[in-house]
From Swiss-Prot:
Residues binding beta-D-fructose 2,6-bisphosphate, per UniProt: 481, 538-542, 576, 583-585, 639, 665, 671-674, 744
Record's comment on post-translational modification: GlcNAcylation decreases enzyme activity. Phosphorylation at Ser-386 promotes interaction with ATG4B.
Primary site of residence: cytoplasm
Tissue localization of expression: Expressed at high level in neuroendocrine tissues.
Keywords from the named record: Acetylation, Allosteric enzyme, ATP-binding, Cytoplasm, Glycolysis, Glycoprotein, Kinase, Magnesium, Metal-binding, Nucleotide-binding, Phosphoprotein, Transferase
Modified residues (Phosphoserine): 2, 6, 12, 21, 142, 386
Keyword Phosphoprotein attached: yes
Protein name: ATP-dependent 6-phosphofructokinase, platelet type
Region (C-terminal regulatory PFK domain 2): 412-788
Location of this chain's protein in the cell: Cytoplasm
Any Pfam family the entry gives: PFK
UniProt pathway: Carbohydrate degradation; glycolysis; D-glyceraldehyde 3-phosphate and glycerone phosphate from D-glucose: step 3/4
Similarity annotation: Belongs to the phosphofructokinase type A (PFKA) family. ATP-dependent PFK group I subfamily. Eukaryotic two domain clade 'E' sub-subfamily.
């Protein structure tokens, strides 16, 4: 099917995986270039999805070197040989740089090794160099086969039968330096390593009043440096794409000394290893240290993170990303025709898309060219909206303009946390406070939710008051589940007396319900006729109007880490099945996505009703599994998935039915899912989305002060969220129709489409709707705001 046919059919009727078959096809999977956490999850997904569709899948060990050497380097993969690799960093099939593949002679050997095994589909996981090599190989394929036939190494029938090579790429790189995708496999895990180090360093730096210069990876791309600076509230950051202006030395020293004068006990400077000045000369960590010591006399230390960033366990985000990419790569290979160009599977917002490989490579090379030619503004733009947005947000939050330079709006904006605590709430508050002050507003903090608002617990909050909040879990302002309904009179009175001109609510489903109650009370209380916006923050990820909520990623990582430990325990014991109960209310997001990230055998959720036959089927599936070399099982259950099929019931059923085959244990994770330091994703998501919310408030308030203007329209009371690739302000009046109030969940949930992936990778038959995929998209088709 051509690309055009594929796009037509996807709009005319649902397209299901059952329509695709891999019978008679062979797929080769290799990892090339620098390793990245999450590569194993991608390999696992390719192997299992390929086998599921009926194709043969081959491991190509040691990257292109293994392809050139052949022999025992190209081995057929079995279902069980990718078990227990999700939680392992690096790549189990090895990666190596290969000079031989750069020559035609080397590629001729590689073609011979592949065609003898019937491999005409290649899935390459690597950086732009690896993907460029794969595309060249694809172009030369028919010529290479003809040459092999002429040399008598293969016959003419083999040339006809395997005339075309299909290539699909997945970008595995911790640097996130590939244009066209919001996130490359490994980047989120590398950010986890950096933030773990920064959090650890902060305690020692505070003890001694030290300045730390942290050098992070990224030779030609400053993404890791920029996002980690945003995530830890660094004082200064050096990037290759955005060199500091002339005289930066004095400006940086002034900023550091001002921060120290505000009683800040530590300074953090983050340097990308490829940092340069405007003359393209390197800026090294040692040079920065020397500068700080000489000019300020501060006790300064340098920490070079190095290969620590490539190591460790992949984050939940990387496992889910890589699993989705791997499945999509197999589908792209099976749908490919001789006319289909080589494509790369990418992430846009929360959607997996296919992009023309060479267009992405060209754009990536254009960034480097722009930097070499000192066209730095263009280089930042070419990196994409996400990078540019991160840079602008960092600049706004890191450096405070002098008070006399900030135009006063004479507006008072209040911030409140509502609902259960969620990691990342404090980052969101910090961002809102600083952006609000930069916009000229007076910012007020409301303590202890709507209870606190009714009781007048409202204080002005300044720029320095929120320093160091980004990395702190929970809610510093205090949060309660109380709704405003019973306090409407008091709340209106407090808002009127404090002259509150706008309200930013950060919280979960209770915050959404509270917003609805305030909207309904506008006709009675004039104090509520002000712009109000809600930023979703809940581990449950159940707020209508947004695909993601602040805190859900941190909870997902907690679940994934716990499941890894439990699986290890089960592997040691043998023949053991664990039942894990997750939070989320009636929303199955944590159970489903946790199951995908941890490699669970099943996940029971409220959104997909199940009965005793399904439980019986799962028990039989686990019984069969115990006959293989993988003698353990993992089952996740959302806390409210069923009134009668409780965790205890499922545990007892499995224990009874598995008697003599496997034994069973249960584990209720509980409130540990709400705690801990926020993940890099939640810190940055909270920071960016709150900044956008404050910009919206400023736009609404512009010119309204002193006019007595009342905000009564639906579009002045909104929920801000990401949907697919776009950042949207949705009026709560509109969202009411999209809400299941009884069960506190949205009526439509995007992640349910990923449910079949979890089932397929756990060896179940599943119907996978491919209607949303299959189209090759242009590289420049970007949404408003990418996932961080």
């Amino acid at each position: 099917m051509s690309d055009q046919d594929s796009s037509t059919s996807s709009t005319s009727f649902p397209k299901y995986l059952e329509h695709l078959s891999g019978d008679g096809k062979a797929i080769g999977v290799l990892t090339s270039g620098g390793d990245a956490q999450g590569m194993n999850a991608a390999v696992r997904a390719v192997v299992r999805m390929g086998i599921y569709t009926g194709a043969k899948v081959y491991f190509i060990y040691e990257g292109y070197q293994g392809m050139v050497d052949g022999g025992s380097n190209i081995v057929e993969a079995k279902w069980e040989c990718v078990s227990s690799i999700l939680q392992v960093g690096g790549t189990i099939i090895g990666s190596a740089r290969c000079q031989a593949f750069r020559s035609r002679e080397g590629r001729l050997k590689a073609a011979c090794n592949l065609v003898r095994l019937g491999i005409t589909n290649l899935c390459v996981i690597g950086g732009d160099g690896s993907l460029t090599g794969a595309n060249l190989f694809r172009k030369e394929w028919s010529g290479l086969l003809e040459e092999l036939a002429k040399n008598g190494e293969i016959d003419s029938d083999t040339v006809k039968k395997h005339a075309y090579l299909n290539v699909v790429g997945m970008v595995g790189s911790i640097d996130n330096d590939f244009c066209g995708t919001d996130m490359t496999i490994g980047t989120d895990s590398a950010l986890h390593r950096i933030i773990e180090v920064v959090d650890a360093i902060m305690t020692t730096a505070q003890s001694h009043q030290r300045t730390f210069v942290l050098e992070v990876m990224g030779r030609h791309c400053g993404y890791l440096a920029l996002v980690s600076a945003l995530a830890c509230g660094a004082d200064w950051v050096f990037l290759p794409e955005s060199p500091p202006e002339e005289g930066w030395e004095e400006e940086m020293c002034l900023k550091l000394s001002e921060n120290r004068a505000r009683k800040k006990r530590l300074n953090i400077i983050i340097v990308s290893e490829g940092a340069i000045d405007t003359q393209n000369k390197p800026i090294t960590s040692e040079k920065i240290k020397e500068l700080v010591v000489t000019n300020l006399g501060f006790d300064t230390r340098v920490t070079i993170l190095g290969h620590v960033q490539r190591g460790g366990t992949p984050s939940a985000f990387d496992r889910i990303l890589a699993s989705r990419m791997g499945v999509e790569a197999v589908l792209a290979l099976l749908e490919a025709t001789p006319e289909t160009p080589a494509c790369v599977v990418s992430l846009r917002g929360n959607q997996a898309v296919r992009l023309p490989l060479m267009e992405c490579v060209q754009m990536t090379q254009d960034v480097q060219k722009a930097m070499d030619e000192r066209r730095f503004d263009e280089a930042v733009k070419l990196r994409g909206r996400s990078f540019e947005g991160n840079l602008n947000t960092y600049k706004r939050l890191a450096i405070k303009e002098p008070d006399d330079k900030i135009p006063k709006s004479n507006c008072n904006v209040a911030i409140i946390n509502v609902g259960a605590p969620a990691a990342g709430m404090n980052a969101a508050v910090r961002s809102a406070v600083r952006v609000g002050i930069a916009e000229g507003h007076k910012m007020f903090a409301i303590y202890d939710g709507f209870d606190g608002l009714a009781n007048g617990q409202i204080k002005e909050i300044g720029w320095g008051d929120v320093g160091g909040w980004t990395g702190q879990g929970g809610s510093i302002l205090g949060t309660k589940r109380t709704l405003p309904g019973k306090y409407l009179e008091k709340i209106a009175e407090q808002m009127h007396s404090k002259n509150i001109n706008a309200l930013l609510i950060i919280g979960g489903f209770e915050a959404y319900l509270g917003l609805l109650e305030l909207a309904a009370a506008r006709n009675k209380h004039e104090a509520f006729c002000v712009p109000m916006v809600m930023v979703p923050a809940t581990v449950s990820n159940n707020v209508p109007g947004s695909d993601f909520s602040i805190g859900a990623d941190t909870a997902l990582n907690t679940i994934t880490d716990t499941c890894d430990r439990i699986k290890q325990s089960a592997s040691g014991t043998k023949r053991r099945v664990f039942i894990i109960e997750t939070m989320g209310g009636y929303c199955g997001y944590l159970a489903n996505m946790g199951g995908l990230a941890a490699g669970a055998d099943a996940a029971y959720i409220f959104e997909e009703q199940f009965d005793i036959r399904d439980l019986q089927s799962n028990v039989m599936h686990l019984t069969e599994k115990m006959k293989t070399s993988i003698q353990r099982g993992l089952v996740l259950r959302n806390e409210n998935c069923s009134v009668n099929y409780t965790t205890d019931f499922i545990y007892q059923l499995y224990s009874e039915e598995g008697k003599g085959v496997f034994d069973c244990r249960k584990n209720v994770l509980g409130h540990m899912q709400q705690g801990g330091a926020p993940s890099p994703f939640d810190r940055n998501f909270g920071t960016k989305i709150s900044a956008k919310a404050m910009e919206w408030i400023s736009a609404k308030l512009k010119g309204s002060h002193g006019t007595g203007k009342k905000f009564v329209s639906d579009d002045s009371i909104c929920v801000l969220g990401i949907q697919k690739r776009d950042l949207l302000f949705k009026p709560v009046a509109e969202l009411r129709k999209a809400t299941d109030f009884e069960h506190r969940i949205p009526k439509q949930q995007w992640w349910l489409k990923l449910r079949p992936i979890m089932k397929i990778l756990a060896k179940y038959e599943a119907s996978y709707d491919m209607s949303d995929v299959g189209k090759l998209e242009p590289v420049h088709n970007h949404g408003e705001l990418s996932a961080i």
